[in-house]
């Protein structure tokens, strides 16, 4: 479900943008919040019932590794929601979806 959502939302976006998706324990999407990758701040909102959180980052130039800002946003999410699984998904028209999992 999450890979399809990443493809639908982000693959055909041609500038860096990120999205935080909150998913419950039944794999239902609870919230979706898009924001500028460079200015995440308070935009990274996580639903209180989330069992898994996906941080999606669009890389229109085809970069397969996280941007430094992706890693900063990931660390900020970890601080907000300790103990919840966070999945980083990098998307782009040329690369499709690449998922990176991080242990809790």
Where are these regions (language model features)?
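Short glycine-rich loop/turn motifs
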Residues: 17-20
